[in-house]
C-alpha cells in the first residue's frame, strides 16, 4: 500500500499518521499538513480500495483488516512507533491499532469518532445507501456535503462544492468497495474493549455535527481510561476542513501534551 511521507523536520521527529473517514482520501487532511509538518513527520495515504491504492475489497472487509494493512505498510516503510489522528472511520482504525499493536501506537486523536455506531448515524447512512442504490455515485456525492458541513458554510462556497463534487465523482471508489467499507464501519464495536486501549487519547468533536452526534464522543471519553475531550462549537462533521484554525490549535496542543505525557510515563518505567 502506497504511503505519502513528509521529510522529518528534525532528527527523530515523532511520526503522525493521518487516517481519513469513509471517503478514504489522504487529501482530506490538506488543511492540517502545513502546520503538522513543522513539528512532525507526517504520513497520509489513500486507504485500500480508494484513490492511488485501488483494489477490490473482500465482502467481509473489516476495520481490523484496515488496521493491519496500515501497520504493515508503516513497518515496511521503517516506521515502528507512531501517533494516529483519525476522523470517523479513521478513528475506528486508530482504536483497532491501539488494541492490536499497542507497542507501536504512541497517541490516538479521535475526531468525531464513536465506540459503536449511533442510531442516528445509522439512519443517516441508510438514507445515503438508498440514494446510492437509486441514483448511483452522483446522488451519493451530491448528498455528501449535507452531512459534512454546516449550512451557512456550504451556502457561501457553492462553486467550491461543485468542484469538489466533480473531483469526487472522477475518483469515486466504486459502489461495491464503498458499501464494504461502510459495512465494516457499521459492524465495528469497541464498547467491550476500551479497557485495553492504554495509549493517551485526545477526543475532538463538533457540537453541530449532523452525522455523528457529539454525545458519541462523550461516551468515548467516559469509556477510555486515559482521554481528554475538546468540543468545537462550530464546524460540522468535517470540522477540520470548515474551521481549520480552531481545529489545528486543538490538535497541535493536544499532540504536544499527550506525546510529552507518554514520554514521561515511559521514562518512569525505566
Curated annotation (Swiss-Prot):
E.C. code: 3.5.1.-
Single GO molecular function: hydrolase activity, acting on carbon-nitrogen (but not peptide) bonds, in linear amides
Top-rank taxon: Bacteria
UniProt keywords, alphabetically: Hydrolase
Gene Ontology process terms (BP): nitrogen utilization; uracil catabolic process
Enzyme class label: hydrolase
Catalyzed chemical reaction(s): carbamate + 2 H(+) = NH4(+) + CO2
Pfam families reported for this sequence: Abhydrolase_1 (PF00561)
Database matches in InterPro entries: AB_hydrolase_1, AB_hydrolase_fold, AB_hydrolase_sf, Pyrimidine_utilisation_RutD
SUPFAM superfamilies found in the cross-reference section: alpha/beta-Hydrolases
Signal peptide positions (record): none
Function field: Involved in pyrimidine catabolism. May facilitate the hydrolysis of carbamate, a reaction that can also occur spontaneously.
Family: Belongs to the AB hydrolase superfamily. Hydrolase RutD family.
Protein name: Putative carbamate hydrolase RutD
Protein's gene: rutD
Amino acid at each position: 500500500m502506497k504511503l505519502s511521507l513528509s521529510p522529518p523536520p528534525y532528527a527523530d521527529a515523532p511520526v503522525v499518521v493521518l487516517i481519513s473517514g469513509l471517503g478514504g482520501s489522504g487529501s482530506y487532511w490538506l488543511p492540517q499538513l502545513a502546520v503538522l509538518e513543522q513539528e512532525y513527520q507526517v504520513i497520509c495515504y489513500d486507504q485500500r480500495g480508494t484513490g492511488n491504492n485501488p483494489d477490490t475489497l473482500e465482502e467481509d472487509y473489516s476495520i481490523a483488516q484496515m488496521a493491519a494493512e496500515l501497520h504493515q505498510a508503516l513497518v515496511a516503510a521503517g516506521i515502528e512507533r507512531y501517533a494516529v489522528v483519525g476522523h470517523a472511520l479513521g478513528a475506528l482504525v486508530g482504536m483497532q491499532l491501539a488494541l492490536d499493536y499497542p507497542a507501536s501506537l504512541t497517541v490516538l486523536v479521535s475526531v468525531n469518532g464513536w465506540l459503536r455506531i449511533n442510531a442516528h448515524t445509522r439512519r443517516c447512512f441508510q438514507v445515503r445507501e438508498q440514494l446510492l442504490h437509486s441514483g448511483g455515485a452522483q446522488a451519493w456525492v451530491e448528498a455528501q456535503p449535507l452531512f459534512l458541513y454546516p449550512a451557512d458554510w456550504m451556502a457561501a462556497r457553492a462553486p467550491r462544492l461543485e468542484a469538489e463534487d466533480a473531483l469526487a465523482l472522477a475518483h469515486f471508489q466504486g459502489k461495491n468497495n464503498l458499501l464494504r467499507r461502510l459495512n465494516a464501519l457499521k459492524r465495528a464495536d469497541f464498547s467491550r474493549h476500551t479497557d485495553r486501549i492504554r495509549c493517551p487519547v485526545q477526543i475532538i468533536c463538533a457540537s453541530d455535527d449532523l452525522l455523528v452526534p457529539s454525545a458519541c464522543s462523550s461516551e468515548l471519553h467516559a469509556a477510555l481510561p486515559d482521554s481528554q475531550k475538546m468540543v468545537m462549537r462550530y464546524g460540522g462533521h468535517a470540522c477540520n476542513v470548515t474551521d481549520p484554525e480552531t481545529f489545528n490549535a486543538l490538535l497541535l496542543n493536544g499532540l504536544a501534551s499527550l506525546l510529552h505525557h507518554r514520554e514521561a510515563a515511559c521514562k518512569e518505567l525505566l
